[in-house]
Amino acid sequence: MKNIRNFCIIAHIDHGKSTLADRLLEATGTISGKASQDQLLDNMDLERERGITIKSHAIQMRYTFKGTDYVLNLIDTPGHVDFSYEVSRSIAACEGALLVIDASQGIEAQTISNLYLALEHDLTIIPVLNKIDLPGAMPEEVKDQIVDLLGCDREDIIPASAKQGIGIEDILQAIIERISPPTGLVDAPLQAMIFDSVYNSFKGVEVYFRIFNGTIKQGDQVKFVNTGKSYEADEIGVLRLGQIPQESLSAGYVGYLISGIKNAREVKVGDTITHVNNPCKEAIKGFEDVKPMVYAGIYPVESNEYEELRTAIEKLQLNDASLVWTHESSAALGIGFRCGFLGMLHMEIVQERLEREFDMTVITTVPSVQFHVIDKQGDLHEVNAPSELPDPNLIDEIQEPFIRAQIITKPEFIGNIIKLCVDKRGALQNQTYLTPERVELTFKLPLAEVVFDFFDKLKTISKGYASLDYELLGFEASKLVKLDILLNEEKIDALSAIVHRDKAYELGKKLCAKLKELLPKQMFEIPIQAAIGTKVIARETIKAMRKNVIAKCYGGDISRKRKLLEKQKKGKKRMRQIGSVEVPQEAFLAVLKLE
């Protein structure tokens, strides 16, 4: 066991984490230079294309140092804020971490939040200054930032360039010398933590785990503590480039388990694996059920594709256990699904995977967050969609989720960023200068304002120099109302939204004006109204198309003309009572893009 090292790589998006992993694999001979492709561990096309890591991955390397053979287990972590729970579980499975920082970008928000996670788990941190070969690199300044942040010596920082292969041997040496080997008892009851799972259509769910205590053998009866289900370990082994089956694995090892599990929901990241007959005393701390933050409706474009969409979502869920869904029907869009996501990036990825892997075109409705409604009896209801909101007379208060957002940026953009956050009902809580060129701003913001277009706007006003990280603070009461849109005095449920009372009037006005542009004219006039409850707060009218009925009247007799006009008016009135308005799809999509 003293020759095992478990480590992960912490970095902000684009700081070169996946490339560094590729170089380490080449240096240890795990892959030959020929067989390699870039971002080897990112095995979804989407991950390679966007250059982000979505799932956690693990791989075992062998390295000989001063005549001793060492086993190095690299556990790759996602870097995006939506996947922070997966990161925390990957970190908990390690004893050390490489903190990779881009020499041209410096320290970013995500780097700091993941670093704090690593320090909470008492990991040994090895700072690596990456991309020193870039013309825009500022190695000395960034070294100062790292020293300020970690309180380490300048000599501890390893300069490297993953692309050129500089400094790779130094990193491997540091992993062996600085990171402590795993501790744990081989003879104790089995205690292992799941940090990831992958769905394989032939073998079922493959579970990736790290053993803290005990030994697992092939054919053992094991159970997952939090779900309480038990399985037989059909196949266990270690992960190199492929899977290598083993007879048994003991404390300190990272491995995989296959036992024909068909449902991905039974495997929860962070759960504890133990033996059925000799269970461990307690589960590993830190397990949480991941709760979705953002909800949106997903509907098929053609209503006859409903079944196909359902199969597609079910298959996606096998690989992505954090996606939750229920059935939902809407008068305007037909039948579809209400899906819960970890955040906006997760939502985009799910949508893109549906289009890519299953060839489905879908409409997504306005994303919203979960609200808590407390009724007059004092009971709490969870509301995931505006249509679920109870009658206003029954509501005592509505609570919405608040987040603490940390934004790191350059000093010249502070004014614009504060203005953006205040417009989004945020409050500035703290402002610290990390270096003269980098400021950390802490805001308290309602999540509902952030899920929409906050990130895009933040990037725009800071010319791309701001990075964001957030965590949920909890629910607080707010003045929220349900804004309905009425067309020809009928509610259009897909356009309803739960908004803050102070913003309702402005939003209602914009929505009505936008719909007036988008809806085609009819033979009768259509009122477009925005209403809160029964009170209309904004209105636009689409004028009717009318035929000139008095064109054939020559001579001046006004009563003849009036008779024809009255007759036309009556016809229009009758039409309006029975006429219904089709809402084109562009209208729904345009509402998403309201400024």
Swiss-Prot record:
Indicate the segments forming the tr-type G domain, all copies.
2-183
CDD domains reported in the protein's UniProt record: EF4_II, EF4_III, LepA, lepA_C
> A Gene Ontology MF term for this entry?
translation elongation factor activity
InterPro entries listed in its UniProt record: EF-4, EFG_III/V, EFG_V-like, EFTu-like_2, LepA_C_sf, LepA_CTD, LepA_IV, P-loop_NTPase
Bilayer topology reads: Peripheral membrane protein
* Cross-referenced Pfam families: EFG_C (PF00679), GTP_EFTU (PF00009), GTP_EFTU_D2 (PF03144), LepA_C (PF06421)
Q: Where in the cell is it found?
A: Cell inner membrane
Q: Does the keyword Transcription apply?
A: no
Sorted alphabetically, the Gene Ontology cellular component annotations on this record are: plasma membrane
GO biological processes: positive regulation of translation
Could you tell me which SUPFAM superfamilies the record lists for this protein? EF-G C-terminal domain-like, P-loop containing nucleoside triphosphate hydrolases, Translation proteins
Q: What's its catalytic activity?
A: GTP + H2O = GDP + phosphate + H(+)
- Supply the alphabetized keyword list: Cell inner membrane, Cell membrane, GTP-binding, Hydrolase, Membrane, Nucleotide-binding, Protein biosynthesis
Question: For GTP, which residues are the binding ones?
Answer: D14, H15, G16, K17, S18, T19, N130, K131, I132, D133
| EC numbers, comma separated | 3.6.5.n1
- Report which superkingdom the organism of origin falls in: Bacteria
HAMAP family hit by this protein: LepA (MF_00071)
Q: Which family does it belong to?
A: Belongs to the TRAFAC class translation factor GTPase superfamily. Classic translation factor GTPase family. LepA subfamily.
**NCBIfam families hit by this protein:** lepA, small_GTP
Q: What does this protein do?
A: Required for accurate and efficient protein synthesis under certain stress conditions. May act as a fidelity factor of the translation reaction, by catalyzing a one-codon backward translocation of tRNAs on improperly translocated ribosomes. Back-translocation proceeds from a post-translocation (POST) complex to a pre-translocation (PRE) complex, thus giving elongation factor G a second chance to translocate the tRNAs correctly. Binds to ribosomes in a GTP-dependent manner.
Protein name per the record: Elongation factor 4
